[in-house]
Each structure stands twice: as structure tokens, then as C-alpha cells.
């Protein structure tokens, strides 16, 4: 700027340090589907761990067994996923040592909500879905927003392909906007839930580059957790 015939703030064109914008988050992709039945719960997640167009791993599980009847699916920023799940496991171990019993699925759901809310000013960049068996032996699914608000549901999808997966669940599990009599609705069995979860991931892998390679499916019952694997496209 010129004033009184001379430059007030001359630009000497001196090269200096440049500070690019700092981004504390990284999206590593991944998708999750969970379905609750009368006496079971099914939760599935793909195994692709990526960043942009780079694939870091094709075999990384995003399902974390917290107890014999509770499984957490977590996708998003992998560093935040490891930090959150590690913290939850430590708290569960402390509870078990203090009370000499394993936390129920409902208690884990509440604890996870509190842990996420404690980080509300710098939230975990993850999409969490918790599935398990409740005190009455019924399947339950809990979904969360970034600051820990918890919602109990019959089925839920999350992650990078969540918007592609959820409408399929609404149609096949929830029978939304379908003129069906109760007698015409297909009964939700374990195999039906596994089939729908598998089909949703096969479809999502065609449209979402952050979802693929394979799917790990956990079938949770009062007797334990059964694990199945489904291969997806790997491109």
C-alpha cells in the first residue's frame, strides 16, 4: 500500500515457512450392517482399510468382540477406532474385576455412549454400531451419532456405504412402503438376516470404492458367536 510516496509495508519476497491447514482426521472407509432378531443378532463389516485411492489392507476386521454376546462394529478413522475400542475394553475389564461378572449388552451400550460424549468437543471420527443379546435373550442393535447419542433399532447400517445399505434394509427387513399383509412378510430368521446382510454388501461394493474385498459376518446367540466370511470384488 502506497502512502506519501513510499511503501508502508514493502514486500521483500522473502521465502518463508508455509503452514498448510491441519486436519486431525483421516477417513479409512468401511461399512457396517447389523440386524436383530428374536433370539439372535447379526453384524457384518467389510475388511478393506483404505485412504483415498490407496488400499492399506484387504483383511482388516472392523468387528470387535467385547464379550461372548456383544460385538462392536466401528469404521471411519482407524486411529480413532483403535483408541475408542481399546478404551472400552479396558473399562470392561475393570468392571469385570470389580463386580466379578461380564457387562451386559445394555450396559456396554450405555458406557459406549458416555465414552463418546466425553469426547464431544473433539469427537471420535467413527461410525459405531453395537449388536448383541440382551438380558431377555433377544437380539438388540444400537447405533450412535458422533457425540454418543444412542438409538436402539431392529436394523441399522453405517460407514461410507451406509446411505446405500440402509434403504435395502428398510425394504427387505423393515418392509417399508410395501403393501404387504402380515402373512406375506418373510419371517426374519438367522439365515434370512445373513442373506440380506450379504446381499447389501455385494451391492454396495459395486458403488462404493471404500467397501470391498470381503465381509466378516458375526452371528450372535446366547450360545456364543459364529463367524462367517463372504468374498467381495477386490478392485
From Swiss-Prot:
CDD domains, alphabetized: proteasome_beta_type_1
UniProt key word Cytoplasm: yes
GO process annotations (BP): proteasome-mediated ubiquitin-dependent protein catabolic process
Annotated compartments: Cytoplasm; Nucleus
SUPFAM superfamilies: N-terminal nucleophile aminohydrolases (Ntn hydrolases)
Organism domain of life: Eukaryota
Cleaved propeptide residues: 1-20
GO CC, any one term: proteasome complex
Keyword field: Cytoplasm, Nucleus, Proteasome
Family membership noted in the UniProt record: Belongs to the peptidase T1B family.
Known partners and oligomeric status: The 26S proteasome consists of a 20S proteasome core and two 19S regulatory subunits. The 20S proteasome core is composed of 28 subunits that are arranged in four stacked rings, resulting in a barrel-shaped structure. The two end rings are each formed by seven alpha subunits, and the two central rings are each formed by seven beta subunits. The catalytic chamber with the active sites is on the inside of the barrel.
Role, per record: Non-catalytic component of the proteasome, a multicatalytic proteinase complex which is characterized by its ability to cleave peptides with Arg, Phe, Tyr, Leu, and Glu adjacent to the leaving group at neutral or slightly basic pH. The proteasome has an ATP-dependent proteolytic activity.
UniProt-recorded name of the protein: Proteasome subunit beta type-1
Organism: Drosophila melanogaster (Fruit fly)
Lineage: Eukaryota, Metazoa, Ecdysozoa, Arthropoda, Hexapoda
Amino acid at each position: 500500500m502506497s502512502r506519501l510516496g513510499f511503501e508502508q509495508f514493502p514486500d521483500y519476497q522473502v521465502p518463508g515457512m508455509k503452514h498448510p491447514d491441519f486436519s486431525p482426521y483421516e477417513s479409512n472407509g468401511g461399512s457396517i450392517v447389523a440386524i436383530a432378531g428374536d433370539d439372535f443378532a447379526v453384524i457384518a463389516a467389510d475388511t478393506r482399510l483404505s485412504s483415498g485411492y490407496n488400499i492399506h489392507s484387504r483383511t482388516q476386521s472392523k468387528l470387535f468382540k467385547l464379550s461372548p454376546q456383544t460385538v462392536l462394529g466401528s469404521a471411519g478413522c482407524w486411529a480413532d477406532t483403535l483408541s475408542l475400542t481399546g478404551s472400552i475394553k479396558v473399562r470392561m475389564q475393570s468392571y469385570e474385576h470389580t463386580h466379578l461378572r461380564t457387562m451386559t449388552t445394555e450396559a456396554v451400550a450405555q458406557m459406549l455412549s458416555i465414552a463418546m460424549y466425553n469426547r464431544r468437543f473433539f469427537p471420535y471420527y467413527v461410525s459405531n454400531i453395537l449388536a448383541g443379546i440382551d438380558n431377555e435373550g433377544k437380539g438388540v442393535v444400537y447405533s450412535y451419532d458422533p457425540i454418543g447419542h444412542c438409538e436402539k433399532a431392529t436394523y441399522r447400517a453405517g460407514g461410507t456405504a451406509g446411505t446405500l445399505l440402509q434403504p435395502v434394509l428398510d425394504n427387505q427387513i423393515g418392509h417399508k412402503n410395501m403393501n404387504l399383509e402380515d402373512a406375506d412378510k418373510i419371517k426374519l430368521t438367522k439365515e434370512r438376516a445373513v442373506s440380506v446382510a450379504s446381499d447389501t454388501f455385494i451391492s454396495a461394493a459395486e458403488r462404493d470404492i471404500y467397501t470391498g474385498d470381503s465381509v466378516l459376518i458375526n452371528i450372535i446367540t446366547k450360545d456364543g458367536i459364529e463367524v462367517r466370511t463372504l468374498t467381495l470384488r477386490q478392485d
